[in-house]
Amino acid sequence: YEQRHFVSGLGCLEYMDIKGKRVPFGTDLLFVCEEEPELVAAAEICEDLWVTLPPSVLHAQAGANLIVNLSASNEMVGKDSYRRDLVSGQSARLVCAYVYANAGEGESTQDLVFGGQNMIAENGVILAEGKRFENGIVCSEIDVQRLNDERRRLTTYQPADDSDHLKVHFHLNVE
């Protein structure tokens, strides 16, 4: 349904000037934490998780161990369980943490209802999940070192060349 309003940004990597700063814009971005360089994040949006080859696969192969999904997945009977299985399964397949933030209260319309099913998964295990149709914060600790160690241990996990991805460095106050 997003194709009614958007076009694919796959393979698009440009720079834009926003408030006087040059900012990378595109789908192939890896966000590397300066204080914890083992933490590498990437993003996908909503239905990316539901397609046959989600962008998170390429992000993980390029080194991302934290995938964030900014979603607006509407509610239907049984969809919450299916969505949970997708998040859990993707984090298991990619040996990564997967943070899923769904549209919620105040974002529904007469056409669609959003329940705000927010989740954090690590290597196939749902670590935290918010209650649907309630506002709140979902948080959990993620063991990035364990994920990286598991990737090195597995012979089935195949990293790929990351030259298609631009690394954007960021600062995180770690206490």
What positions do the PLM features span?
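Enzyme catalytic cores with a strong preference for nitrogen-chemistry domains
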Residues: 1-175
